[in-house]
Amino acid sequence: MKPFQLTVKAKSDLKDIALFTSRRWGREQRNIYLKQFNESFWLLAENPDIGKTCDEVRDGYRKFPQGSHVIFYQQIGSQNIQIIRILHKSMDVNLMLGE
């Protein structure tokens, strides 16, 4: 079992990012970017405190930059994290996470 899980919205975010990247820069770049996200997920799972706290957005949430995006996550239990959303850095975080 992976030490991280993605919410339905995070999976949708990742799918949208993959589609946009593939259309804009091609499959090879899409694969590189998705691999970088996967590596970040594992890094966060192994070091959950590495991300910056963002309690102003939601209590218990942390954020971690990945390319042009920001991964929002929270620790669940002692050895797992939940990826909440993956948002472009230009998005209105309060609006997107307030859903």
Walk through the language-model features, giving the residues of each.
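Arg/Lys-rich, positively charged N-terminal/basic patches that mediate binding to nucleic acids
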Residues: 1-34
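Generic alpha-helical structural context detector
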Residues: 19, 39-42, 85
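Basic/aromatic recognition patch in beta-strand/loop cores that engages polyanionic ligands
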Residues: 38, 49-78
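Short proline/glycine- and basic residue-enriched helix-capping loop/turn segments at helix->loop/beta transitions
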Residues: 45-46
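Enriched for short, Lys/Arg-rich terminal
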Residues: 74-99
